[in-house]
Amino acid sequence: MPDENYYIYYPYQSDMTGKTAASTGATLTDAEFYAPLIDSWQPRKDQSSYEAYAASDLMTANGSVENGTDNSLTLTFSMAHRMALAVVELPAFVYRFTNQHSIPDYVFSSPTEFDSEALPYLVSDGTCRYLFHPSAGMELSAYNDSRQCEFSIEIQPNQIAGGSYRLYKPNGGRVMKLHTLQVGDFFLADGHLLPYDADNEKVQTSNVVGIVFQTNPARIGDAEKKVLGGEVHALVMALKNAAVDVTFWITRPVESYLPACSSKAEGYNDISGYWNSEQMRKACGDFSSYPALKAADEYNKYYPVPATTTGWYLPSSGQCWDLLQYLGGCPALADPAEQTSDALGYDERLGQGDVPAALNKWMAKIADKDKHTFTSDDNIWTSTWSRSSVHNWAIYAGGVFCRYLYSAIDYESMIVRPVLAF
């Protein structure tokens, strides 16, 4: 109707008494009509949930009217934000990989906690957002997991107009580095990477916790991919054993909670130690009856890693296969005929060179106190099941031996060497 005006606002308020301007006979804009509401609006201090953030986002509109068919009217509203918005690009490090085969960017940052009264809404794109009244300004401060100040932002009153936003990049925001991801690269406790050919001093002054042994996404399990949000980059071997001379189980179960892998191909294709471990945890409640799984899991207490990883776990037989192929230099394990064979996986491969020495070579730059070297006749537990037994890889000077152990007794040195995916 020509003499009528239509106004809307969001979010809904149960009491709008005194929140709209008195009629003067003149046509008012929505900003003028809702001036008392806008002036008195107080965004929530804690906007850390989407619901709280949305409830703080005052919007208004003045409707336009169009005549439709059959004497109908069409009302159109275009909502305008009335609060000011601070968008903060959280400090993060981005590795952009230059490998020939495509590997997604690896993004990580220290956990950020806010200690200001203002608590922003964290968005999945690596930013946080906070709405505030333009006339009030705001202060936002955060610290990292070392309890050190990460950043502090102060916005003065009327510095940002209502309906506007400003992007802040404390500490430079996202920092990008080009890197060619390779087997042998060093993985650090804070999530950073060092190239495999970094000099000794750089390696020994960095907090290295693992060695990259697989960079092919096709050889990383679906469970690892799922827990990492669908994007994976590599597998990493720990520098130390989680346990030595430990059994896989205390009392051998009558049946397994895992699928049986008996052939070479089945062992090679079992590439998700994370799934195996979590399946056992789900079925049994905990790892109290499975010392090898428990040792790998508890390794996370002593050598914590960022949330951008799976955390440490017991590798599967296929992951151990890759570890021995790429770090151990075993030519038989690189043979496609072996990888696709239906023959029994319980098999000794001779003529593979000094496998422990080959593995240790990748850790040569690591200080002795920060690593456990491999020795001849080490037996590496895996989480792969074979009917009533568990896959175990023996390594020695001259070859490797994939055994199926039917009992929990020791065979030479039974070790747990955890892995992780990132």
Region spans (language model):
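Short, low-hydrophobicity acidic/polar segments
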Residues: 1-85, 93, 161, 169-170
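Tryptophan-paired
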Residues: 1-24, 95-172
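Low-complexity, serine/threonine/proline-enriched polar segments
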Residues: 37-56, 252-288, 292, 343-370
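Short, compositionally biased
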Residues: 141-146, 154-308, 409-422
